C-alpha cells in the first residue's frame, strides 16, 4: 500500500483491478474542505488516460511490476521483436503495446520490458537516446525570429525540434520521456 501523498510521475498503481501509471498529479488544498490529489492515470493494458481524484493520505495498492532487460532486434511492420539478454528467449510485442516508444527504438538497443502478473504491459526506454538526423532544413544565419529551432527527421522516422546549428548527419541526444532535443552527441 502506498499513500497518495507519495505519488510521483511514473509510479505504477492498481485501481479497480487494473494497472495504471501516474502520468500527472497535483496536490490541492482548497480553502474550505479537506485536501485531495488530482491525477491523470494511464491504463497500462488499454493505453486510455483517465482523470481520478483521491483524498489526501488515501492508501492505494502499488502494482508490483517486473522489469526484464531485453534487446530490441527488429520489426516486421506490426510486431516488434525483443530478446532477453540472459536467457536469449525472444518476445514479440504489437505496435499498440509500444505506443510512442517506437519513435526511439534502434536496433540492438537495450530496454526494459514491464510485466504484471505474467502479462506484458509495455516497455521502458532509457531516459535518453542518441539518434542520427537524416533530414533537416539548412539553418540560415540570423534566422532566429522563430525561437531558433527547426524540424529534424531522425533515423527512426521521428520528427523533433532542434536548434538551427544542427545539420543532416549530426547525432543528437533525445529525452525519451518528453521527446525533446537535449544536446549534440
Curated annotation (Swiss-Prot):
One of its GO terms (cellular component) is cytoplasm. Keywords: Cytoplasm, Elongation factor, Protein biosynthesis. It is found in: Cytoplasm. GO terms for biological process: peptide biosynthetic process. GO terms for molecular function: translation elongation factor activity. Pathway: Protein biosynthesis; polypeptide chain elongation. It holds the Pfam family EFP_N. Transmembrane segments: none annotated. Gene3D superfamilies: 2.30.30.30, Nucleic acid-binding proteins. It comes from the Bacteria. Its main location: cytoplasm. CDD domains: S1_EF-P_repeat_1 (cd04470), S1_EF-P_repeat_2 (cd05794). Involved in peptide bond synthesis. Stimulates efficient translation and peptide-bond synthesis on native or reconstituted 70S ribosomes in vitro. Probably functions indirectly by altering the affinity of the ribosome for aminoacyl-tRNA, thus increasing their reactivity as acceptors for peptidyl transferase. Belongs to the elongation factor P family. This is Elongation factor P.
Amino acid at each position: 500500500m502506498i499513500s497518495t501523498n507519495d505519488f510521483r510521475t511514473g509510479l505504477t498503481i492498481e485501481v479497480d483491478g487494473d494497472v495504471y501509471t501516474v502520468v500527472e498529479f497535483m496536490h490541492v488544498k482548497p480553502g474550505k474542505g479537506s485536501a485531495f490529489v488530482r491525477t491523470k492515470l494511464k491504463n497500462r493494458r488499454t493505453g486510455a488516460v483517465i482523470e481520478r481524484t483521491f483524498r489526501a493520505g488515501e492508501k492505494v495498492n502499488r502494482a508490483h511490476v517486473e522489469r526484464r532487460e531485453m534487446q530490441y532486434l527488429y520489426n516486421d511492420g506490426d510486431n516488434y521483436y525483443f530478446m532477453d539478454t540472459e536467457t536469449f528467449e525472444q518476445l514479440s510485442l504489437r505496435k499498440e503495446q509500444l505506443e510512442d516508444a517506437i519513435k526511439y527504438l534502434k536496433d540492438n538497443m537495450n530496454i526494459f520490458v514491464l510485466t504484471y502478473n505474467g502479462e506484458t504491459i509495455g516497455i521502458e526506454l532509457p531516459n535518453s537516446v542518441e539518434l542520427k538526423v537524416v533530414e533537416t532544413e539548412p539553418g540560415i544565419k540570423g534566422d532566429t525570429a522563430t525561437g531558433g529551432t527547426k524540424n529534424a527527421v531522425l533515423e527512426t522516422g521521428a520528427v523533433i525540434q532542434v536548434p538551427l546549428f544542427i545539420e543532416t548527419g549530426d547525432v543528437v541526444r533525445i529525452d525519451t520521456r518528453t521527446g525533446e532535443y537535449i544536446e549534440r552527441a
